[in-house]
C-alpha cells in the first residue's frame, strides 16, 4: 500500500474513491503487510468509512473475483449479516421462494460468522450444493435459475485480509463489503444491513458502483432483514435516483408480527424449519416474515408490481408445494432439471 494513502487514512482524513481503489488493489493482491493492513482498517473504522471508500474497496475486490459469466438479469438477496439476533435465515428462504417463481437468483453468501447459522450452513444442511465452481454456478443459474455463490470460493483475495480481521476482532469496512461483491454481476439486489448508518453507506456505495435497482433495508430494533414487528427503513435505488421511506406490516398486507416469530437455531433446526415452511405447515409468523422479504425481492426483480402482490405470490409458493418441489430439484442437483418442471 502506498505510504501516503496509509498516512492519510491514519491522520483521519477521507480517501477519494481512487485512493481507496488503489489501497484495495494492494490488499487484494497481498502486497500489504499485516501490520499496515490492520492500521489502515482500524483507521477507517475509527473515523468512520465513507461511501466513496467503500465503493473503491469494492471495485478493487471485484477485479480480483474468480471469473464467471455475468448474469445481469439475476438478483441477489445477500445482506451483511452481523446483527447478532440469531434469527432464522429469512433472506435465504426468500431467495429460494423467489427462484421457485421463475426469477433467476445468484445468492451470494458465506458460513456463519456471528450468527448461529449462515446461508451456506442452512443450504448445505438442506441438501443444496454450496461449494460449486464458477462453471458449476453458471450451469445451475442457466438450468435451474438458482445458484449459491460461496464467498470463499469466489473471493480468494479475501484470504489476504482474513488473518488481520480475525486479529482485530472488530467490525471493519469488510463487514459491509459482501453485498457489493456478487460474482455474477447482478444489477438488482435486496440488501439487509445491520445498522441504519451502515445501510446508508451500502446504498450510496451501490449507487456509485452503478446498481440498476436495489432496496437496502434495516429492520427497526437492529435487524438486517425486513421485519413485521416494527418499521423497516428502506433506501430505494433506481437508475441512480435514491429515495428513503419506511414500511410497516400494512404495506405488505400482513398482520403485525413478534420478534420471537423470527427465532432460529443451528443449521439442523433451521433446515427443519425451512422444510416445514415449504410444506405449508411452518409457523405462521415466520412464514409471513419470509413472504415479506420475498416480496421485496419480487418487487426488485419486476416480477411483482406491488408488495402485496409479491406477498401473495410468495405465500402461494410456500403453501402450494411449489417452493418445496423447487427445493427438491436443487437437492437432486440434476443439471437437466428446468424450472418448468416445478410449475
Question: Model regions: which residues?
Answer:
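Active-site cofactor/substrate anionic-group-binding motifs, chiefly glycine-
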Residues: 48-112
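N-terminal glycine-rich anion-binding loops that anchor highly charged ligand groups
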Residues: 1, 9-55, 62-70, 289
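A glycine-rich phosphate/pyrophosphate-binding beta-strand-loop-alpha-helix module
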Residues: 41, 88-144
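Short amphipathic alpha-helical face segments that pack within enzyme cores
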Residues: 39, 93-97, 289, 293-296
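Glycine-rich anion-binding loops and their surrounding alpha/beta cores
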Residues: 8, 14-15, 63-66, 87, ...
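N-terminal basic/disordered segments at the start of proteins
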Residues: 1-13, 77-85
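Short, small-residue-enriched loops and turns at beta-alpha junctions
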Residues: 27, 45-48, 81-86, 112-114, ...
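Short glycine-rich or small-residue beta-strand-to-loop segments that form or flank ligand, phosphate
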Residues: 10, 41-45, 76-81, 297
Amino acid at each position: 500500500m502506498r505510504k501516503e494513502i496509509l498516512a492519510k487514512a491514519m491522520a483521519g482524513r477521507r480517501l477519494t474513491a481512487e485512493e481507496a481503489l488503489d489501497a484495495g488493489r494492494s490488499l487484494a493482491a497481498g502486497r500489504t503487510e499485516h501490520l499496515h493492513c490492520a492500521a489502515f482498517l482500524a483507521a477507517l473504522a475509527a473515523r468512520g468509512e465513507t461511501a466513496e471508500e467503500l465503493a473503491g474497496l469494492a471495485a478493487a475486490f471485484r477485479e480480483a473475483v474468480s471469473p464467471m459469466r455475468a448474469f445481469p438479469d439475476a438478483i441477489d438477496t445477500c445482506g451483511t449479516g452481523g446483527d447478532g439476533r440469531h434469527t432464522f435465515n429469512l433472506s435465504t428462504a426468500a431467495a429460494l421462494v423467489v427462484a421457485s417463481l421463475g426469477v433467476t437468483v445468484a445468492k451470494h453468501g458465506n458460513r456463519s460468522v456471528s450468527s448461529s447459522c449462515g446461508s451456506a450452513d442452512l443450504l448445505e444442511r438442506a441438501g443444496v450444493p454450496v461449494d460449486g465452481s464458477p462453471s458449476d454456478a453458471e450451469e445451475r443459474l442457466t438450468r435451474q435459475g438458482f445458484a449459491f455463490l460461496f464467498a470463499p470460493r469466489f473471493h480468494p483475495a479475501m484470504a489476504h485480509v482474513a488473518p488481520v480481521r480475525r486479529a482485530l476482532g472488530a467490525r471493519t469496512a469488510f463487514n459491509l463489503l459482501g453485498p457489493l461483491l456478487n460474482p455474477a454481476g447482478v444489477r438488482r439486489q435486496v440488501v439487509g444491513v445491520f445498522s441504519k448508518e451502515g445501510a446508508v453507506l451500502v446504498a450510496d456505495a451501490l449507487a456509485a458502483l452503478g446498481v440498476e435497482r436495489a432496496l437496502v433495508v434495516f429492520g427497526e430494533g437492529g435487524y438486517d432483514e425486513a421485519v413485521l414487528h416494527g418499521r423497516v427503513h428502506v433506501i430505494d435505488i433506481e437508475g441512480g435516483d435514491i429515495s428513503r421511506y419506511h414500511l410497516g406490516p400494512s404495506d405488505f398486507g400482513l398482520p403485525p408480527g413478534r420478534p420471537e416469530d423470527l427465532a432460529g437455531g443451528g443449521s439442523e433446526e433451521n433446515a427443519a424449519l425451512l422444510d416445514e415452511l415449504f410444506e405449508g405447515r411452518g409457523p405462521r409468523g415466520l412464514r409471513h416474515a419470509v413472504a415479506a422479504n420475498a416480496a421485496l425481492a419480487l418487487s426488485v426483480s419486476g416480477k411483482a408490481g406491488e408488495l402485496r402482490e409479491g406477498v401473495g405470490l410468495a405465500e402461494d409458493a410456500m403453501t402450494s408445494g411449489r417452493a418445496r418441489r423447487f427445493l427438491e430439484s436443487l437437492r437432486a442437483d440434476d443439471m437437466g432439471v428446468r424450472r418448468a418442471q416445478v410449475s
